[in-house]
UniProtKB/Swiss-Prot annotation:
Top-level taxon in the UniProt lineage: Bacteria
Organism: Staphylococcus aureus (strain bovine RF122 / ET3-1)
Gene Ontology, cellular component aspect: plasma membrane
Family listed: Belongs to the UPF0754 family.
Protein name: UPF0754 membrane protein SAB1779c
Record key words, sorted: Cell membrane, Membrane, Transmembrane, Transmembrane helix
Organism lineage string: Bacteria, Bacillati, Bacillota, Bacilli, Bacillales
Topology in membrane: Multi-pass membrane protein
Main location: membrane
TM region(s), chain numbering: 4-24, 354-374
Record's subcellular location: Cell membrane
InterPro entries in alphabetical order: DUF445, UCP032178
Statement: the UniProt record of this protein carries the keyword Membrane: yes
Alphabetical list of PANTHER family matching this protein: UPF0754 MEMBRANE PROTEIN YHEB
């Protein structure tokens, strides 16, 4: 009976010692949070393991995550996966549908990234356009008009300059045949008669003013169809056109004239652009929006993935994943880290404590046997 009591007593003592030892060991992982000193000597095991090695742990966790978990290869594979493609494409489609549904304008879109497009156009647009036009004038002012125009436009004008004769003569004939033309001829005759006095009075003895006006009108109309008159008009137009093409830009417009045109044009362009910026994009560019919804989402998703893949290494270096994780862990309160680890490994820590009690009890059992037989 005495021997049984000794064994039980040793088992209980061993279990208590083993269990409490493990509990203390687990607590010493976290506590104390700061070192303690007796006089100038630091108390051993202060601070606890995790507070003491906190920076090293943070560095190691960051290294492990960067080198073995969130690696460049793994992220690249995920980016190129079908799920990523579908997710990015779906997001683009949602934004495009919102663009159509909400009737968003360019101004509303740019305002979402804190850009006032109207203000930008007014403050920078005028100056930029005028500056570009003036730079163009300075660079090309000695060149001929023909050399400045696109070759296709010059070719088109060369081929159709003769058509100007038909157009001009047709317009002149229509004007002369109209009531306005008749009235203008009569008005000019009245002025002419008033200025010439007696000479015209003698002429009116043979013809009335109306007959004279009618005769002049008929002759002018006939001239618009006369081959010689048309040849003269064609020659004049061709010569003027050729002179215009061969004229340097600075002879057609001097610097002050061009500057005035540039300023007026820049104001017109920016004002027009500001008005257009307030119109819904779907109204302003319906075909472009259809293209965006139909084809661009897939192409844009591929482009985004491709560019991310190409620049992933640079991005990861800029992000500095290891440093970011290390910084974040070092900002955590030690209480929070303790709570986090206990929540994650609560079951395992309890098993460790239980194992301490069990091993302590087993050791106590053998110590009891030794105490009895020795």
């Amino acid at each position: 009976m005495n021997a049984l009591f000794i064994i039980i007593f040793m088992i209980v003592v061993g279990a208590i010692i083993g269990g409490i030892t493990n509990v203390i060991a687990i607590r010493m992982l976290f506590h104390p949070f700061k070192p303690y000193y007796i006089f100038k000597f630091r108390v051993p095991f202060t601070p606890g393991l995790i507070p003491k090695r906190r920076e090293e742990i943070a560095t190691k966790i960051g290294q492990v995550i960067e080198e073995h978990l969130l690696t460049e290869t793994l992220i690249n594979e995920k980016l190129k996966s079908e799920q990523s493609q579908q997710a990015i494409e779906s997001m683009i489609q949602q934004q495009l549908q919102k663009l159509t549904k909400d009737q968003l304008s360019i101004k509303q879109i740019t305002s979402q990234i804190d850009i006032d497009i109207e203000q930008v156009l007014q403050t920078n647009g005028n100056q930029y356009i005028a500056s570009q036009l003036n730079n163009y004038y300075t660079k090309h002012q000695n060149q001929t008009i023909a050399s400045l125009l696109p070759n296709q436009l010059v070719t088109f004008l060369d081929q159709h300059v003769d058509n100007a004769t038909d157009l001009l003569c047709d317009r002149a004939r229509n004007y002369l045949s109209s009531a306005k033309g008749t009235q203008d001829i009569n008005d000019m005759l009245d002025t002419f008669f008033n200025e010439k006095g007696k000479l015209i009075g003698m002429l009116q003895m043979f013809m009335t003013k109306e007959s004279i006006a009618d005769r002049i009108q008929q002759e002018l109309i006939r001239l618009t169809s006369h081959p010689k008159a048309r040849a003269i008009v064609t020659s004049l137009i061709t010569n003027e056109y050729q002179t215009f093409k061969d004229k340097p830009l600075n002879e057609l417009l001097d610097a002050s004239q061009f500057n005035e045109i540039a300023e007026n044009l820049s104001v017109y362009v920016t004002t027009y652009a500001s008005k257009q910026a307030n119109k819904p994009v779907v109204t302003l560019m319906p075909q472009f929006v259809d293209y965006l919804e139909g084809q661009l989402s897939s192409k844009l998703a591929n482009l985004i993935i491709e560019q991310l893949s190409i620049h992933l290494s640079t991005i990861m270096k800029k992000v500095d994943l290891r440093g970011l994780i290390e910084e974040q862990i070092n900002t955590f309160d030690l209480d929070y880290i303790e709570k986090l680890i206990i929540e994650i490994a609560n079951k395992e820590l309890k098993l460790i404590m239980s194992l301490g009690f069990i091993l302590g009890g087993i050791i106590g059992f053998f110590q009891g046997l030794v105490a009895i037989f020795v």
